[in-house]
Amino acid sequence: DVDVQCMGEPREGATAHAENYPEGANAALRVFGADLSMAAAIPKVDLVHSHTWYANLAGHLAGLLNDIPHVVTAHSLEPHRPWKAEQLGGGYRLSSWTEKTAFQGADAVIAVSAGMRKDTLDSYTNLDPDKVHVVKNGIDTEEFKPDPGTDVVTGLGIDLDKPSVVFVGRITRQKGLIHLVRAAEKFDSETQVVLLAGAPDTPEIAKQIGDAFAHLQSGRGNVL
């Protein structure tokens, strides 16, 4: 059996914990509040597994509290994301501390690629390499599979007869969207630029991308 604890809005198959306490506190502290709630809510289990710094504290505390193994999965690393200080302020030091503490205390670390394993060992040099394993992300091929239909694509205004450059992801410095938008000014005019982007890290980066996107639209067509 698997018991799932998560953050955010309630959802089927999981126990959700809101990031709203302490009210008005730095975002990292509110994540910690949700982590404490998670650690307290975990039932009797044999092992706890956490993903990213957002849940690492919950996993670390639950492991200590219940004397059970804690496994962490490394998707990204806080030492490689200094721009998160723009979003979290001093909370970036807290997120970095949490990740480091959880990784160093974990019974095993799962990296989602060989490159992530190397980065993890480079970032946390006292980790035992034998405890760091590679398990690549899996995909449910029943839910996610090629769809030959074109209704959604054409409904967005995309011309199937023209080449397209497509971005899908969050608006965050880590993904380098601003560089794509600026480079798109030099694309062939027949090339469509399709941006499926959202969830900006900060209002500042949202404005930066919005301004660059508007400038791109003013200078060429085929921008969606």
Question: Where in this protein do the model-derived segments appear?
Answer:
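N-terminal subdomain of nucleotide-sugar transferases
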Residues: D1-E12, E185
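A short, charged, and often flexible helix/loop element on the N-terminal side
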Residues: M7-P43, E86-Q87
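Carbohydrate-associated surface elements
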Residues: G8, G115, G138
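Short His-centered aromatic/hydrophobic patch
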Residues: S50-A55, A74
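Nucleotide-sugar donor phosphate/pyrophosphate-binding loop at the beta->alpha transition
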Residues: P69-V71, P79-T101, K118
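A short helix/loop element that forms part of the nucleotide-sugar donor recognition site in Leloir-type
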Residues: K145-I158
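Conserved donor-binding/catalytic core segment of Leloir-type glycosyltransferases
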Residues: D159-K175, V181-E185, V194
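Nucleotide-activated donor-binding/catalytic signature segment of Leloir-type glycosyltransferases, i.e.
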Residues: K162, V194-A197, A206-L224
